[in-house]
Amino acid sequence: MNARVYRVLPAVFTLVLLACASATANDPLLLDSRELVKEFGSALQSELKHGLTEGGPVAAISVCKDKAPQIASQLSRRSGAKVRRTSLRHRNPANAPEPWEAEVLRQFGLPSSTTDSTAPPEYFSKADDGSARYMAVIRTGPVCLACHGDSLAPEIAAKIDADYPHDRARGY
């Protein structure tokens, strides 16, 4: 009889976990968070494409430096959420992760670069007061490696060195 109980219990735990995951997947705060990340990514990608077209990778550095914080600020004001970028290997010390963010980033396995087709890792946690925390990975694509890769063109390295003297966001 004990053997039968042991076979049933894992199935019950799996069903309970799946039910919880389903409830979380439909949480309005999670859905809103995903939408904000999507909006941020689309706006930043559009600005980067424009910068690359107008002035190449050196101009794109200014997009990440100036436009990305503006986009995050606009989304923050509109939504009431705190929208920002962070990394364990940040370029700007102002973007250093808070302790909880650093822990989530370590759980994600960052700062590894992943460009496979699986869904990027995300984190969602809801507090008792109704607030929530959400993080999602920004994938490092081939165009990103011009400024974040192992080998940078001299003019790109010089611009990054001038704009970010404490840069830690290379070598992906």
Per-region residue spans from a language model:
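Intrinsic disorder/low-complexity signature
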Residues: A3, A23-T24
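Extracytoplasmic c-type cytochrome modules immediately beyond a signal peptide or single-pass transmembrane anchor
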Residues: T24-V143, E155-Y172
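Bacterial N-terminal signal peptides that target proteins for export
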Residues: M1-V12
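Detector for the c-type heme attachment site
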Residues: L145-L152
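Exposed boundary/loop context
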Residues: V12-F13, K49
